């Protein structure tokens, strides 16, 4: 049943008003008085997050504008994720943003508009709606990546991201145009019904082009080459937001598109083969390329590439759901298990990664460096920062009893239950290999000689953000039930 009520768009409307309103405030306030942008943004995000949580549990599911936009718990879960990510980034940037004297007023509004674009991607029921959300998110990141006006690396990263991002968007848009040419519609449900059970060459080409476009956004190999340079050159807080929320938005759109593909068995089979190959090479190359890195932001870039490979394993479980009868598994159950694993892991990935980047931001601000060697003796210079970074990278490695272990358990068990044990084995082996380069950071922090390096003071909002990320990472590893139930509810909303 289609309905159009503005109340269903409340979260998106709030974010749009806040983003544009903060731009206006930044124009009105004199440059020396723009410190007030931080508390305004912080309280605005807290209020919006509270509403998004309420909407998730009590808002219900509906489609409106002829299915162009979906108000369901799947989208609601991602709205919470994007707001949590934005909130943690804002908490870690109060002092960092203060040094941007000329551009301080634009930082927070751009962050909110990027989050708005992500929400549009997560809720899109139409390929063009999804593309509009993607472009809103991407254009704001073009600006934010190049936000260091006097840093050549930041400017270079911004130009590279602009050129490569535009190319990937063009590929994605061409894939959408092929689908429109085949079906006469861009509305996902209509497209799914129009494609039928068989696929021709054009259908397969459209699928590959769409997956290539998504692959760029989530840093899948071989569409990952942009990530190391952009992660290294961008301001640390923007790298954090790009590595977490932007990646999650790409997965949200990919999952909705994959549900569309499953109606066409030929497309589903082609997509399954492609994703199996991409997942394997992404996990392997991402982890192996992290070993020689000397810059921590480049290392985290390759870590993020590997993490994308793990998450794709959950999407593979969704793909198998279209033909799992051969394994004696209920397709709906297989579908929900795969999506649940993806959603759970993305949320804990946000906390672990942003905890790590909160430390990276403060070390970069205090020392002016993001080289791993400059983390020597950090445990003595800033015990809290060292503890947060240690727990964050161990969670990313999947070490129990941290949340990352539970997340990988959900992802790998979803495909094991459906017979694809080999891809889970690759994921497990690569997770164990990743422990080496993660522990190399821990080793230099606790055993390295930090003599002559400055203190790394952590206080105020940044301290709270670090502690909160660390606590959530521990608690969700010991007691994952509440988040797992939310992920299950969100996944189930896609099959209602």
UniProtKB/Swiss-Prot annotation:
The alphabetized UniProt keywords are: Cell membrane, Membrane, NAD, Quinone, Translocase, Transmembrane, Transmembrane helix, Transport
- Membrane topology of this protein: Multi-pass membrane protein
Main subcellular location: membrane
- Please give the biological process terms from Gene Ontology that the record holds: ATP synthesis coupled electron transport
| Subcellular localization(s) per the UniProt record | Cell membrane
Q: How does it assemble?
A: NDH-1 is composed of 14 different subunits. Subunits NuoA, H, J, K, L, M, N constitute the membrane sector of the complex.
The family line of this record is: Belongs to the complex I subunit 2 family.
Reported function? NDH-1 shuttles electrons from NADH, via FMN and iron-sulfur (Fe-S) centers, to quinones in the respiratory chain. The immediate electron acceptor for the enzyme in this species is believed to be a menaquinone. Couples the redox reaction to proton translocation (for every two electrons transferred, four hydrogen ions are translocated across the cytoplasmic membrane), and thus conserves the redox energy in a proton gradient.
Q: What name goes with this protein?
A: NADH-quinone oxidoreductase subunit N
Q: Which organism is it from?
A: Desulfitobacterium hafniense (strain DSM 10664 / DCB-2)
- Gene of this entry: nuoN
